[in-house]
Amino acid sequence: MATLKDQLIHNLLKEEQTPQNKITVVGVGAVGMACAISILMKDLADELALVDVIEDKLKGEMMDLQHGSLFLRTPKIVSGKDYSVTANSKLVIITAGARQQEGESRLNLVQRNVNIFKFIVPNVVKYSPNCKLLIVSNPVDILTYVAWKISGFPKNRVIGSGCNLDSARFRYLMGERLGVHPLSCHGWVLGEHGDSSVPVWSGMNVAGVSLKTLHPDLGTDKDKEQWKEVHKQVVESAYEVIKLKGYTSWAIGLSVADLAESIMKNLRRVHPVSTMIKGLYGIKDDVFLSVPCILGQNGISDLVKVTLTPEEEARLKKSADTLWGIQKELQF
């Protein structure tokens, strides 16, 4: 007896089931799910896989997204504790790890998360040996280094979300002050994602007009308008949001989807993301810090050589030394 499906549909060919644009998100906490929904709403993948260790939560999140399929353009959403569900991913986004507690610095999380990465990364590599890895878990610069070491991937394929969000926060606050949309407010925050990030005051502009040229005191202590406060707010903003709602999610999710779009669509846009920076700015160790990078289908193909003031360069170097001090003690 022919089934209803057979009566309705005449099959012409057996299709091979390898996805062309698959994205995996590891970790379905607040950040992972914000990444997932942002990616789904930008139509970046033909398959989305979710992985976590908490099976009930994982299945619930998957079902909840699947029930929205009518309103999305991603035909397959899968999940599992076993990494076989991640096979053939183009991009794997790692958000899993211990969460930052109120008042806790990102660097404090480090050894807890290294141990988690020792399990995750080899499993990802096993099933998607040609993927790009996008690291979001904190402290992101150190964990990007850890993922690079464990994976054995070339450095172009291991990317940290880095200062993409810090720069977005900076441009939002700049826009609020000037009454201009953040897209038209240009400014870069580089270095460590977190407390020692470096705002590049010389690069701040609207429509190519340098703010530093108009206002030479910009970013200095003697600035009457105290633009330094804008960067201070960027540094404090995550702590404030965590204090108020317990975690951050939406902005980082949108920021990650922005990076995923450049990678999946080979856009070659420039983003401040964490990459291996050894040999630049007098840095001699294997550290990952954010500099402006061209992102496309191969991950980071190029980076932009930013001219820094001696003070900015010294701050970057100091960040690198701090990170290396922690990295060289890590057990993995």
Curated annotation (Swiss-Prot):
Instruction: Say if the entry is tagged with keyword Chaperone.
Output: no
Give the modified residues of type Phosphothreonine.
Answer: 18, 309, 322
Q: Where is this cross-link: Glycyl lysine isopeptide (Lys-Gly) (interchain with G-Cter in SUMO2)?
A: 57
Task: For this entry, list what GO says about its biological process.
Answer: lactate metabolic process
Residue positions, PTM N-acetylalanine: 2
| Alphabetized InterPro entries for the sequence | L-lactate/malate_DH (IPR001557), L-lactate_DH (IPR011304), L-lactate_DH_AS (IPR018177), Lactate/malate_DH_C (IPR022383), Lactate/malate_DH_N (IPR001236), Lactate_DH/Glyco_Ohase_4_C (IPR015955), NAD(P)-bd_dom_sf (IPR036291)
Binding residue positions for NAD(+): 29-57, 99, 138
The record describes its post-translational modification as: ISGylated.
Q: Which residues carry this modification: Phosphotyrosine?
A: 239
**Xref: HAMAP family:** Lactate_dehydrog
PANTHER family per UniProt: L-2-HYDROXYCARBOXYLATE DEHYDROGENASE (NAD(P)(+)) (PTHR43128), L-LACTATE DEHYDROGENASE A CHAIN (PTHR43128:SF10)
Which named protein is this?
L-lactate dehydrogenase A chain
Q: What is the lineage of its organism?
A: Eukaryota, Metazoa, Chordata, Craniata, Vertebrata
Gene (name only): LDHA
